Amino acid sequence: MFFLKNLKRTRRNPAAPRQNHLTLTVGILLTASASFAEDRITLNTKDDGYRGIWYMNRPLKSVYKYKYSGGLGTYCAKHKPFAVCCDTVNKTFFCYGGTSKANNRSLIHMVSYYDHEKKVVPRPTILLDKKTGDAHDNPVISVDAKGHIWIFSTSHGTDRPSYIHRSRKPYDIDAFELVPATRLQDGNQVAINNFSYFQAWNLPQKGFVCFFTKYGWGADRALAFITSSDGVEWSER
């Protein structure tokens, strides 16, 4: 509707420069495209319970069946942290790899908290559908100095994208927004859209320090770290 209204207005004003018409139209289309892309990723809906993903790895020809398997909603050991205690609001915020009622091997990224005063947990927020059954894609969590909750959605390798989300309000899990994060590469800002085995730490008055694995950075698997004061623009690896 906004696009159509502006088209009508420009038609009524023949004296307006043609270049301005094009700029306005392109700007609206780009904004709509970005919003659509975010809406397809960020769900911001509520679940009616807690269901962690079940996952198995490397079938074996023995009585053990798999190298490992079971409920792996907070897998793996390299991912940190899954929970952050915030004394300011007396709550511990946490994330985990959830799943749907229909399929316990479909990975959904979930966010919630434990209220230490009331000793209860709310209905968790469904952040996004990772479109995989691989628990290596489980998320990790961080909380910045202003109380905003950050979720880093990892990927196992390069076949799937990674995402960074931030809560719209401090200490609140009801709504998250996709962060258009970038990092320095050869003096230019490039999109951050893939990372594995992520660890995210927020330091007072300094911001984020993150450690992770990146595939294809001069080796099959490279260990790296990046920093950021705001979570949007990140340093070079």
Model segments located where?
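N-terminal secretory signal peptides that target proteins for export/translocation
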Residues: 1-18
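Short linear sequence elements within intrinsically disordered, low-complexity coil regions
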Residues: 7-8, 25-26, 59, 119
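Short stretches within intrinsically disordered, low-complexity N-terminal or propeptide regions
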Residues: 16-18, 34-36, 83
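Generic detector of N-terminal low-structure segments
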Residues: 4-5, 22, 38
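Bacterial N-terminal signal peptides
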Residues: 23-32
